[in-house]
Structure formats: structure tokens, C-alpha cells
Regions:
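Start-transfer (signal-anchor) and selected internal transmembrane alpha helices
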Residues: 1-32
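Hydrophobic/aromatic pocket-lining and membrane-interface residues
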Residues: 89, 125, 172
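Membrane-interface junctions at the ends of membrane-embedded or membrane-associated helices
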Residues: 1-7, 127-131, 173
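Hydrophobic alpha-helical transmembrane segments
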Residues: 13-17, 108, 137-141
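Membrane-interface coil-to-helix junctions
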Residues: 23-121, 141-163
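Specific aromatic-rich, kink-prone transmembrane helix
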Residues: 162-173
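Transmembrane-helix signature of polytopic, membrane-embedded enzymes
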Residues: 122-144
Length: 173
């Protein structure tokens, strides 16, 4: 039993590393931060999300309130922003970045979320279909690298749904 658990963890680690390596190579080739001067901040990420993450950074460091912000339009409750944009438990990682490193944080979160989507899909394939290592790695890497993930990496909060979907499917099964 112990060998089965260790084997499962190693398989999930490999499933995590493959798409992370692919994304890092792409970021290096394209010169995207942290490997270059370009960022993942385009469209909504540039116009809205970086400010939301700046607010979250302030909250995590005790400089702002979770409930209200005077910086929201003319001031207002923040529950909608938190629930829709920045409420992911993964965003706690922002605490370890400087406020000036929001672009780096967002790039890191794209990499992390894509890797985690591979892990959850690999785990699903392992438990649901008992696939061998190679087919499961190919399918989980394909799942992690699908166009939806790449396209919506600019709105990385949507990637949380891709991470959780295989777990939900496993629960339904």
C-alpha cells in the first residue's frame, strides 16, 4: 500500500513538472517575466487584475481591509471583487512577493495553475481509469496545455475551475 501511495505521488509530481517545464520554455523563448521583460499582463489583467492583486497584497500585509476599500470607485464593499477575482486560496502565495512584483506573481500563478491542472487530471486518470504512466502523462499534459488554459492565462482566476474539474468529476464518479 505504501509503495502504491509513493508511486502515485511520484506520478503526480512528474505530471506537474512536464507542463511547467513546457510553459517555462515558452516564457523563456518569448521573453516573458521572470525570464524577460514582457509580462502576461494584457487586456483585463493589465487594466484590472493587477490592481486587485495590489489590493490583496495590502490586505495580506495588514494595510487594507477585506470588507471595504476607498480605492474602489468612490469606495465600496469588496466582497464581489474577492469572490469573483482574488478569492482563490492559491493567491496566498502573493504574500511572499513584493508589491512591485505583481507581474511576476501573475506569471508564477499561470505556471503553478497549469501545473496543478495537470496534477488533478493525472490523479483523475489514475483513479478513474487506472491508466499506465505514459498515456496518463500524455493526456494530463494535453489537458494542462489546452488552448483554454493558454488563452485564459491572462485571466488566471478562470484556471482554478480547470484545476478543480477533475476532482469534481472524480467525486461524481
Amino acid at each position: 500500500m505504501k509503495n502504491k501511495v509513493v508511486n502515485s505521488r511520484i506520478r503526480c509530481l512528474i505530471a506537474f513538472c512536464i507542463p511547467v517545464l513546457i510553459i517555462c520554455i515558452c516564457f523563456i523563448c518569448l521573453g516573458i517575466t521572470p525570464f524577460g521583460d514582457k509580462t502576461v499582463l494584457i487586456w483585463d489583467a493589465k487594466l484590472q487584475h493587477k490592481d486587485y492583486y495590489g489590493y490583496l497584497w495590502d490586505v495580506l500585509h495588514g494595510k487594507a481591509s477585506l470588507q471595504y476599500s476607498a480605492g474602489k470607485s468612490l469606495g465600496g464593499r469588496m466582497i464581489g471583487i474577492i469572490g469573483f477575482y482574488i478569492g482563490s486560496p492559491l493567491n496566498i502565495v502573493l504574500y511572499f512577493f513584493k508589491k512591485t512584483q505583481i507581474a511576476e506573481f501573475m506569471a508564477f500563478m499561470v505556471i503553478l495553475r497549469i501545473g496543478l491542472s495537470a496534477v488533478t487530471s493525472h490523479y483523475y486518470l489514475l483513479k478513474r481509469f487506472q491508466l499506465d504512466l505514459l498515456p496518463a502523462l500524455l493526456i494530463s499534459t494535453s489537458y494542462a496545455m489546452m488552448e483554454y488554459n493558454i488563452y485564459y492565462s491572462r485571466n488566471n482566476m478562470w484556471l482554478d475551475g480547470v484545476i478543480i474539474l477533475p476532482i469534481v468529476a472524480l467525486g461524481v464518479w
